[in-house]
């Protein structure tokens, strides 16, 4: 019953918002430029925070995360991983290299380290496939430069994966294609 009341209130609010946004200056300007309307609020991921068992307590593994983006940092902390950061730089290769170097320094203290970059996702959202290719190539160069460090210990498993597909063209933001995984 409470969920139904919440859904009804949210639906009412979203309808009001839709109509209010139709008349705003930004919307009128977007229409004049032939751009898609901005006429809704994103309500995904809404909910209450609840207790989550820590990753170390569930698996016995001590982990760290070196991620770009506050959401990944918060998620790491939520599940009991140590969140580390590097000084952000605009150069994709240098940024990823700094993350990998920090991972190398941290390896003796952790069972696994999650290194994340949003760079390919951000490039894909620009809908410029050349930009996405350049970002992936920059990440490859950074990874190649760090392979001696990552391959010196046979017990180290390096996994490269994508969290989701982001088309470089068309209207979709994310899509459902399979993503590559390299081990």
Where are the model-predicted features located?
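Feature captures the catalytic ectodomains and active-site-proximal regions of enzymes
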Residues: 1-183
């Amino acid at each position: 019953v409470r969920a139904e009341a919440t859904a009804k209130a949210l639906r009412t609010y979203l309808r009001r918002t839709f109509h209010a946004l139709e008349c705003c200056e930004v919307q009128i300007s977007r229409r004049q430029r032939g751009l898609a309307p901005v006429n809704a609020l994103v309500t995904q991921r809404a909910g209450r925070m609840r207790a989550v068992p820590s990753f170390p307590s569930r698996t016995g593994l001590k982990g760290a995360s070196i991620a770009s983006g506050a959401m990944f940092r918060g998620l790491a902390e939520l599940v009991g991983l140590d969140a580390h950061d590097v000084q952000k730089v605009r150069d994709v290769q240098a940024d990823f290299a700094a993350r990998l170097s920090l991972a190398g320094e941290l390896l003796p203290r952790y069972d696994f380290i999650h290194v994340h970059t949003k760079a390919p996702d951000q490039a894909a959202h620009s809908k410029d496939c050349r930009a996405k290719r350049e970002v992936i190539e920059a990440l490859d160069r950074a990874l190649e430069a760090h392979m001696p460090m990552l391959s010196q210990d046979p017990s180290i498993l390096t996994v490269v994966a994508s969290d989701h597909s982001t088309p470089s063209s068309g209207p979709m933001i994310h899509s459902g294609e399979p993503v590559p995984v390299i081990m």
